[in-house]
């Protein structure tokens, strides 16, 4: 290859191939076709596309507003962008690749598995190995609310099977999932639910904001990932009808939860409280109040029962890089007020920050919260510890909590204890985000009413859903359930440890 070609490969983090006939052929074709006026050709592993000419090849979608050249060498793609170009890339290598062993290629582009929600970025490269399960769709869809978002999905050889790949269904799509921002007011939400090709308010037809860039074909593309993903993850609305759904909470238990609220700041209950306060933070990086928000719950034990002491449902004002700090500040106020209402009671405050959506942001929330609570911690003399998770194959523990299979056990435990009257709310329940407009207990009960169990194939395959009908989000419910679980019997995989600044202390 020429020196300029080698420099271009290194610029994008790829090792220049040595004596690779495919790579040489692609490079030659790229040089030859770059001067064409309206190119649209496929040669071996090279694909060139002209402006506004979407093309489909090997389940790949590359719509561009400007020039984009894709050259494959080994198992990787070199993507050369011109100004103002963007694309949604799904790529599958043509098996077999016999030259891969003789001509290995390395890449620093597709190297990040953690999420970046809540942070400002331009490009996101996702390997299919990180999202072949439908549960990861909720994380991917969260990126679509950011206006300067470009997603690159690099698929593996599993792309050809729908059972192992979410991207297989995208072969019939005509749009890219880029720059997707939508606005739907409460008055027109039912209309969007009923009409499958509507993505924004009808009242914005004449004066459409510049940030509304979605059309019905993009909504269809989103639905190809997971059914009802547009309404659930972007618009915040309905959930598809289930074949088998059962109510799991007795009305008698909900009435008891609303009526009986013991005082936890007065004698004798204050002396019988556990010395451990457990907080669970379920962060959501979205400003759409019809979709998911951040759920925060604080619980402790009182004579064998779980008592809810604090509850927050927090929404960001805007999608900025300060999302982690704002969520930490909300949690800080809730924990601080709870401790001040029960001075000298708690000897340890345990905090679990869920990291399923974004491990980077969860770590930032934990570190920021530790800094904010440091003065109060010194004044009241309690220890502040955070739930840690150890990555597979690593001895390093990080200050976030990954929610996996224990979610079903947590809901089973919550339902059992709630129906038996062992889940209560304190009269001194702290809430800075819910109390202004609603009774926090009634707010939580409304979410509990939506809780259903969906059984697909026997009791072994059951899924709990709290978004029935799209009436309310289930963020507070999930936070309360997980806080009660961690307080009663659950423990993080790597235990609880203190954090200080940017260094986790074991």
Swiss-Prot record:
It is found in: Host nucleus. Keywords: DNA-binding, Host nucleus, Hydrolase, Viral genome packaging, Viral release from host cell. It comes from the Viruses. Gene3D superfamilies: 3.30.420.320. One of its GO terms (cellular component) is host cell nucleus. It holds the Pfam family DNA_pack_C. InterPro entries: DNA_pack_C, DNA_pack_C_sf, HSV_TRM3. GO terms for biological process: chromosome organization. Its EC number is 3.1.-.-. Its main location: host cell. One of its GO terms (molecular function) is DNA binding. The active site is at 128 (for atpase activity), 282 (for nuclease activity), 354 (for nuclease activity), 475 (for nuclease activity). Belongs to the herpesviridae TRM3 protein family. Component of the molecular motor that translocates viral genomic DNA in empty capsid during DNA packaging. Forms a tripartite terminase complex together with TRM1 and TRM2 in the host cytoplasm. Once the complex reaches the host nucleus, it interacts with the capsid portal vertex. This portal forms a ring in which genomic DNA is translocated into the capsid. TRM3 carries an RNase H-like nuclease activity that plays an important role for the cleavage of concatemeric viral DNA into unit length genomes. Interacts with the terminase subunits TRM1 and TRM2. Interacts with portal protein. This is Tripartite terminase subunit 3. The gene is TRM3.
């Amino acid at each position: 290859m020429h020196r300029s070609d080698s420099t271009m490969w290194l610029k994008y983090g790829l090792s220049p191939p040595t004596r690779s006939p495919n790579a040489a052929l692609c490079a030659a074709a790229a040089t030859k076709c770059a001067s064409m006026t309206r190119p649209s050709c496929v040669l071996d592993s090279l694909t060139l596309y002209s402006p506004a000419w979407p093309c489909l090849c090997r389940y790949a979608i590359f719509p561009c507003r400007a020039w984009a050249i894709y050259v494959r060498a080994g198992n990787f793609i070199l993507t050369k962008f011109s100004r103002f170009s963007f694309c949604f890339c799904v790529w599958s290598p043509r098996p077999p690749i016999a030259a891969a062993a003789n001509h290995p290629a390395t890449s620093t582009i597709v190297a990040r598995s953690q999420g970046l929600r809540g942070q400002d970025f331009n490009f996101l490269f996702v390997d299919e190995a990180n999202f072949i399960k439908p549960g990861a769709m909720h994380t991917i869809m969260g990126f679509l609310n950011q206006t300067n978002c470009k997603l690159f999905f690099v698929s593996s050889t599993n792309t050809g099977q729908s059972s192992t790949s979410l991207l297989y269904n995208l072969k019939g799509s005509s749009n890219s999932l880029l720059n997707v921002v939508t606005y739907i007011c409460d008055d027109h939400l039912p209309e969007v639910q009923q009409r499958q090709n509507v993505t924004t308010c009808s009242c914005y037809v004449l004066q459409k904001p510049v940030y509304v860039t979605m059309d019905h074909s993009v909504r269809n593309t989103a639905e190809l990932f997971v059914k009802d993903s547009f309404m659930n993850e972007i618009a915040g609305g309905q959930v598809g009808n289930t074949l088998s759904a059962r109510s799991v909470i007795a009305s008698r238990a909900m009435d008891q939860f609303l009526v009986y609220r013991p005082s936890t700041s007065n004698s004798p209950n204050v002396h019988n409280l556990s010395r451990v306060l457990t907080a669970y933070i379920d962060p959501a990086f979205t400003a759409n109040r019809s979709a998911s928000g951040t759920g925060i719950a604080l619980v402790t034990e009182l004579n064998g029962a779980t008592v809810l002491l604090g509850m927050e449902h927090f929404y960001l004002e805007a999608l900025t890089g300060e999302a982690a700090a704002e969520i930490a500040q909300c949690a800080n106020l809730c924990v601080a007020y709870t401790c001040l209402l029960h001075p000298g009671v708690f000897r340890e405050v345990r905090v679990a920050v869920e990291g399923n959506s974004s491990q980077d942001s969860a770590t930032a929330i934990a570190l920021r919260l530790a800094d904010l609570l440091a003065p109060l911690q010194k004044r009241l003399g309690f220890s502040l510890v955070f739930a840690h998770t150890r990555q597979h194959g690593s001895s390093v523990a990080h200050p976030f909590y990954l929610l996996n299979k224990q979610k079903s056990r947590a809901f089973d435990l919550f339902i059992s204890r709630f129906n038996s009257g062992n889940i209560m709310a304190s009269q001194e329940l702290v809430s800075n985000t819910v109390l202004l407009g609603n009774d926090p207990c009634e707010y939580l009960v409304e979410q509990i009413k939506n809780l259903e169990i969906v059984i697909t194939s026997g009791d072994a395959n059951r899924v709990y859903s709290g978004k029935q009908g799209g009436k309310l989000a289930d963020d507070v419910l999930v936070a309360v359930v997980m806080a009660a679980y961690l307080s009663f019997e659950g423990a993080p995989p790597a235990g609880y440890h203190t954090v200080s600044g940017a260094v986790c202390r074991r």
